[in-house]
C-alpha cells in the first residue's frame, strides 16, 4: 500500500480530513501494522590498508549489496512496537593470505559457527574476477569477533595459512609509532616454527594486530597494539636463542613513517633502551641498479653469486621468489635495463652453503625461456671492473694479416649492426709480418659476438687471436712498417672478404668456407704445381677482365702478369688457398666476378696502364 522512496512519508496524507478525535488511537495501531518493511542500511567500508592494489575489487556476488545489513525480520517488532530504525554497529575483520580457491561461500562455511557472524567478502580483480588474496568479515559481537580471530588465525584453509586482523581504517593508528617488531635470523627451516606458533609465542605478552613470517629472508614481523609491549618483547628476545638459533629483533619503521618530515624527532623520543632495527634486508635504496651506493654494498664474500642472462622484464621480487628456494637471501643487486637483451644480478645468501647449492642448481637452468649463467661472485674490486665493462668493452686483436685492416673490421661490424666505439691498428710484428690492434664496443654483448667470430679464425692467411687484455709482449707500431705501406683501396668493395661481410652475415657459409682451412690443411697443399696452376688460372681471369678500350697496353702478356701479381700480393696477401677458393666461386656468383673486376681496374690504374 505504501511505496519506499527517499522522501519521508507525510503523516497528513494518511489521515482523512473528517476523522474524529476519538478515532486517533485506532489510526495509530493501523499505521504500525501497515508499515512492516523498513530497511536499515549499515555500510561497512573495506580496510584501506589494501587499497594500494592496482585494480579495484568487487564482491564475488555482484548481484547482492556489499556490507549491507537489511532488517526485514517481521519478528523484529514485538507487541506492535516498532523497532525498525534500530541498528547495531558491526565489527569488521580483515582476512588475508587467502588461497586463490577460497570464495565467500568457503568463508561463510568456516565462520557460521559463531552466532554473531553476519557476512564475508572476498575481494576480486575488477577485470579478471580472480581473488586478490584478501577479504573482510563482519560480526555483530566484538567478543565473538576476537574469539574467532584467536581460534582461527594462522590456521590452514585450502592448504594455506590465513591471517586475520582488525580492519583498521585509520592509517595513523594502524602504523602506530614503535609497535612493529622486526625479527631476523629466524630458523624458519625448522618445521616446528609455524606462523601459528610464532603468534602464540608473543600473544601472551600483549594483543597482536598482525604477525608475518618470510622464509625467503628468514625474517618476521609482529605488530603489537601497545608500544610498551613491543619494547618489552625486544628486551626479552634480542640476541637470545629462539628454537635453537640466535635471533635479533628491534623496532621496524614502515616506509611511510620513515618518509614523514618529523621522523627523526619522533624516533628520538623513544626510550633509550629501545633497540631500533639495524638490519634492513633488501633496503629500498638498493632496489635500483643506478644507485651509486648499491655498487658498494657487497663485500667480498663466499655467500654471493653472479647471475647473467636474466630476461629484461625480471624484477627483484622475481629473483627473490625464485632463488630463495635454496635458502634465505640477504640482499639483491639487479642491473638496469640496457641496450643488451638481458639483465644480470648479484644475490647474497645468508649462508655460504646455500650459495653453493644455487650455483649447482641454477647454472644452465632455463628461467622464463632464457638460459642462466650462475657463477661464484667476484670480490669487490673484480665486480667493480665487471660493472664498468658493461659500459665500454675493449677487444684486443693479435696476428692480423694486412687484409684484416681497419676497413675490413669496420665493415665486419657494420654487417652485424654493431657500432664500434673505436677501431685502431697500433702494432706490427716484423718476424711474422702481422699486426695487432683493438676494438672498443659500446657494450659487452657486441664485444662477445666479435670475439667468438674472430678468435682462432683464419683471415687473409693469418689465424687471428682475440683476448680481453693486451698481451704484454705485443709489438708496438713503427713508422717504417705497418699498414700505411700496404695499398689501401679507395673502393672497399675490391678488398678480400668485403663481398662476404657486405652480402652475408658472420655465419655466412662463404665466410666459413674461406676461413675453415687450418694450418694442417695448408701443409698438405704446399707444392709448386698446385701454386702454379692456381696462379695460371687467376692470370687468365685477369686477362679476361681487362678493358682494352680503357687499358690498351695492359693486355700485353708481361703486363697481364704484372697486374695479376699486384692483385695477388696486395689484395690476397699471396695466400694461394684463399685465392683458389675465391676462384672456385666465380662461375657461381656474378657478385664475385664484379669484385674481381674492380680489383683489376684499380690495379691497372695504380700501375699506370690507364689511357
From Swiss-Prot:
The record lists the organism as Saccharomyces cerevisiae (strain ATCC 204508 / S288c) (Baker's yeast)
Pfam families under this entry?
RRM_1
Which keywords does this chain's UniProt record carry?
Nucleus, Repeat, RNA-binding
Q: Where is the composition biased (Basic and acidic residues)?
A: 45-54
Q: Where is the RRM domain?
A: 91-169, 179-247, 303-379, 393-471
| Principal location | nucleus
Tell me the lineage of the source organism.
Eukaryota, Fungi, Dikarya, Ascomycota, Saccharomycotina
Q: Which GO terms describe its molecular function?
A: mRNA 3'-UTR binding; poly(A) binding; poly(U) RNA binding
Region Disordered: list its residue ranges.
Answer: 37-81
What is the recorded name of this protein? Protein PES4
Q: Where does it localize?
A: Nucleus
UniProt GO cellular component terms: cytoplasmic stress granule; cytosol; nucleus; prospore membrane; ribonucleoprotein complex
Q: Which PROSITE patterns match?
A: RRM (PS50102)
Q: Which GO terms describe its biological process?
A: mRNA localization resulting in post-transcriptional regulation of gene expression; mRNA metabolic process; regulation of translation; sporulation
Amino acid at each position: 500500500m505504501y511505496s519506499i522512496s527517499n522522501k519521508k512519508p507525510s503523516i497528513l496524507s494518511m489521515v482523512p480530513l473528517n476523522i474524529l478525535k476519538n478515532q486517533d488511537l485506532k489510526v495509530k495501531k493501523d499505521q504500525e501494522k501497515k508499515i512492516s518493511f523498513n530497511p536499515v542500511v549499515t555500510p561497512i567500508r573495506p580496510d584501506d590498508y589494501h587499497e594500494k592494489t592496482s585494480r579495484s575489487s568487487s564482491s564475488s556476488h555482484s548481484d547482492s549489496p556489499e556490507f549491507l545489513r537489511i532488517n526485514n525480520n517481521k519478528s523484529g517488532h514485538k507487541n506492535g512496537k516498532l523497532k525498525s530504525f534500530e541498528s547495531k554497529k558491526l565489527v569488521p575483520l580483515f582476512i588475508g593470505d587467502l588461497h586463490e580457491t577460497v570464495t565467500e561461500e568457503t568463508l561463510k562455511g568456516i565462520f557460521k559457527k559463531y552466532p554473531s557472524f553476519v557476512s564475508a567478502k572476498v575481494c576480486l580483480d575488477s577485470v579478471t574476477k580472480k581473488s586478490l588474496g584478501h577479504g573482510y568479515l563482519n560480526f555483530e559481537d566484538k567478543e565473538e569477533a576476537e574469539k574467532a580471530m584467536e581460534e582461527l588465525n594462522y590456521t590452514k584453509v585450502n592448504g594455506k595459512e590465513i591471517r586475520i586482523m582488525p580492519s583498521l581504517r585509520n592509517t595513523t593508528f594502524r602504523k602506530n609509532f614503535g609497535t612493529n617488531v622486526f625479527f631476523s635470523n629466524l630458523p624458519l627451516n625448522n618445521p616446528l616454527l609455524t606462523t601459528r606458533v610464532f603468534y602464540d609465542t608473543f600473544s601472551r605478552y600483549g594483543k597482536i594486530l598482525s604477525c608475518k613470517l618470510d622464509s625467503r629472508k628468514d625474517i618476521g614481523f609482529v605488530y603489537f597494539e601497545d608500544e610498551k609491549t613491543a619494547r618489552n618483547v625486544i628486551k626479552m628476545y634480542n640476541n637470545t636463542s629462539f628454537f635453537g638459533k640466535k635471533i635479533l629483533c628491534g623496532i621496524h619503521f614502515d616506509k611511510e613513517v620513515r618518509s614523514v618530515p618529523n621522523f627523526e624527532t619522533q624516533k628520538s623520543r623513544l626510550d633509550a633502551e629501545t633497540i631500533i632495527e639495524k638490519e634492513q634486508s633488501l633496503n629500498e635504496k638498493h632496489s635500483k641498479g643506478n644507485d651509486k651506493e648499491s655498487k658498494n654494498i657487497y663485500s667480498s664474500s663466499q655467500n654471493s653469486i653472479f647471475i647473467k642472462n636474466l630476461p629484461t622484464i625480471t624484477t627483484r621480487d622475481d629473483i627473490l621468489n625464485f632463488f630463495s628456494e635454496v635458502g634465505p637471501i640477504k640482499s639483491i643487486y639487479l642491473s638496469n635495463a640496457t641496450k643488451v637483451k638481458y639483465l644480470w644480478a648479484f644475490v647474497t645468501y645468508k649462508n655460504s652453503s646455500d650459495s653453493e647449492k644455487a650455483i649447482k642448481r641454477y647454472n644452465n637452468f632455463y628461467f622464463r625461456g632464457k638460459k642462466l649463467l650462475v657463477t661464484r661472485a667476484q670480490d669487490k674490486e673484480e665486480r667493480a671492473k665487471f660493472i664498468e665493462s658493461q659500459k665500454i668493452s675493449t677487444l684486443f686483436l693479435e696476428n692480423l694479416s694486412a687484409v684484416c685492416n681497419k676497413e675490413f673490421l669496420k665493415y665486419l661490424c657494420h654487417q652485424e649492426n654493431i657500432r664500434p666505439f673505436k677501431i685502431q691498428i697500433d702494432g706490427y710484428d716484423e718476424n711474422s709480418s702481422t699486426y695487432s690492434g683493438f676494438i672498443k664496443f659500446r657494450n659487452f654483448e657486441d664485444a662477445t659476438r666479435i670475439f667468438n667470430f674472430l678468435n682462432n679464425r683464419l683471415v687473409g692467411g693469418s689465424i687471428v687471436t682475440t683476448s680481453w687484455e693486451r698481451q704484454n709482449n705485443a709489438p708496438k707500431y713503427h713508422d717504417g712498417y705497418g699498414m700505411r705501406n700496404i695499398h689501401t683501396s679507395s673502393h672497399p668493395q675490391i678488398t678480400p672478404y668485403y663481398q662476404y661481410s657486405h652480402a652475408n652475415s658472420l655465419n655466412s657459409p662463404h665466410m666459413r668456407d674461406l676461413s675453415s682451412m687450418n694450418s694442417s690443411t695448408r701443409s698438405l697443399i704446399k707444392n709448386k704445381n698446385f701454386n702454379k696452376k692456381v696462379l695460371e688460372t687467376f692470370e687468365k681471369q685477369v686477362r679476361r677482365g681487362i678493358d682494352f678500350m680503357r687499358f690498351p697496353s695492359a693486355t700485353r702478356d708481361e703486363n697481364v702478369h704484372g697486374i695479376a701479381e699486384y692483385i695477388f700480393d696486395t689484395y690476397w696477401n699471396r695466400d694461394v688457398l684463399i685465392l683458389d677458393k675465391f676462384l672456385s666461386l666465380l662461375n657461381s656468383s656474378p657478385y664475385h666476378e664484379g669484385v674481381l673486376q674492380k680489383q683489376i681496374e684499380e690495379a691497372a690504374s695504380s700501375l699506370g696502364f690507364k689511357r
